[in-house]
Amino acid sequence: MIGYTTIGVKNLDAAKTFYTKLFDAEVLVDVGRLAMIGQTTDQPMVAVCEPFNGEAPSVGNGNMIAFPGGSKENVDKMYEKAIALGASCDGEPGQRIEDVFYGAYVKDPDGNKLCFFDFS
């Protein structure tokens, strides 16, 4: 159902490096101030961009982007990879809802909150 989500960033090159390495993905579209990152354009993508209005990007209060991990082990791996790539911890991996939801939370180098999760 989701085609892509857009994240405002301060440094486009650094953001492209962070997200391509985090997801083992590629820059599929690059138009200067915006890049779309993913496996293919017919699957959900992450777009990183410098805001069109030229002002500094800001993090929305209460906004978060969640990415499926596929398993608890993969959630842990994604969390560790994000931290190694410069993200900060916003909630270590763990069971959030007993027997239902396992998640880990980070903030990317621009402060955007990300969640890696598995329904298990």
Predicted regions mapped to residue ranges:
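Short glycine-enriched loop/turn motifs at secondary-structure junctions
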Residues: M1, S58-G62, E98
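Conserved active-site alpha-helix within GNAT-family acetyltransferase domains
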Residues: L12-L22, A104, K113
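Short, conserved charged micro-motifs
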Residues: A14-K16, K72-K77
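N-terminal beta-strand motif that seeds the catalytic metal site of vicinal oxygen chelate
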Residues: M1-K16, I65, S120
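Vicinal oxygen chelate
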Residues: Y79-S120
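Conserved acetyl-CoA-binding loop of GNAT-fold acetyltransferases
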Residues: K21-L28, A87-S88
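Short hydrophobic/aromatic beta-strand element in the GNAT-like acyltransferase core
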Residues: T6, M45, A66, G103-A104
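Conserved short beta-strand elements that form part of the metal-binding/catalytic scaffold
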Residues: E26-G60, L114-D118
